[in-house]
Amino acid sequence: MLSRRIIPCLDVRDGRVVKGVRFRDHVDMGDIAELAQRYRDQGADELVFYDIGASPEARSVDVAWIERIARLIDIPFCVAGGIDSVETARRVLFAGADKVSINSPALGRPELITELADEFGVQCVVVGVDSVRETDGQWRVRRFSGDPDKTQAVPLRTLDWIVEAQRRGAGEIVLNCMDSDGVRRGYDVVQLQQARALCQVPLIASGGAGAMEHFAEAFDQADVDGALAASVFHSGAIAIPELKRYLRGQQIEVRDVY
């Protein structure tokens, strides 16, 4: 069985790392390069950088900081935010990113997923899914979630979108359960289980990690391939080496920390 991945997520705004609760009230968490190097040294398996203002502000991601990160770390990293064309994705990948993640642009033009997969290969194409449970009990997707004032509901069931994204060429799905984001009460295991039943590509859990047990629950109960987290790593509440030792003690296979 492949090792499960531990993935710090760094939300980027104006070249700084920020973090909010349920995508609101963002506070500064530090320098992007310093945090990236820290996580690399601690044994992170990969990193995700999300330019949270790019899509809501209808601009492209700034490749200057991508080039800076690529020179500093030697683990895979993915870039998300404002990637709305093959040309933009090419700039991001050529700047040093290993993968691109698309979310709002794919909802506006789903064929973008196929275009990117055809051009760069499915291994480079991640589809991020921001999901909210609505009053009727159904999970539905949101777009432009990087800015609470611009977030839009989309009349599309989360599970239906996961199926369509795979059909169009997504090589990986990151399911961000927005109701859990930043509150540290655990991943939405029920939603992840339903997504896992439909997901034939790697599935990454996002939103809600607050304790080491939450990672184990996502791996054991939802069989996700990786777990993404932000605030617990940025704040120092959980250190990656200790987390990996804990997971190995739970018979969950993770890569060694070198």
Swiss-Prot record:
It catalyses: 5-[(5-phospho-1-deoxy-D-ribulos-1-ylimino)methylamino]-1-(5-phospho-beta-D-ribosyl)imidazole-4-carboxamide + L-glutamine = D-erythro-1-(imidazol-4-yl)glycerol 3-phosphate + 5-amino-1-(5-phospho-beta-D-ribosyl)imidazole-4-carboxamide + L-glutamate + H(+). It is an enzyme of class 4 (lyase). Transmembrane segments: none annotated. GO terms for biological process: L-histidine biosynthetic process. Its main location: cytoplasm. Pfam families: His_biosynth. It is found in: Cytoplasm. Keywords: Amino-acid biosynthesis, Cytoplasm, Histidine biosynthesis, Lyase. The keyword Cytoplasm applies. CDD domains: HisF. InterPro entries: Aldolase_TIM (IPR013785), His_biosynth (IPR006062), HisF (IPR004651), IGPS_HisA/HisF (IPR050064), RibuloseP-bd_barrel (IPR011060). GO terms for cellular component: cytoplasm. The keyword Amino-acid biosynthesis applies. IGPS catalyzes the conversion of PRFAR and glutamine to IGP, AICAR and glutamate. The HisF subunit catalyzes the cyclization activity that produces IGP and AICAR from PRFAR using the ammonia provided by the HisH subunit. This is Imidazole glycerol phosphate synthase subunit HisF. It comes from Stenotrophomonas maltophilia (strain K279a). The lineage of its organism: Bacteria, Pseudomonadati, Pseudomonadota, Gammaproteobacteria, Lysobacterales.
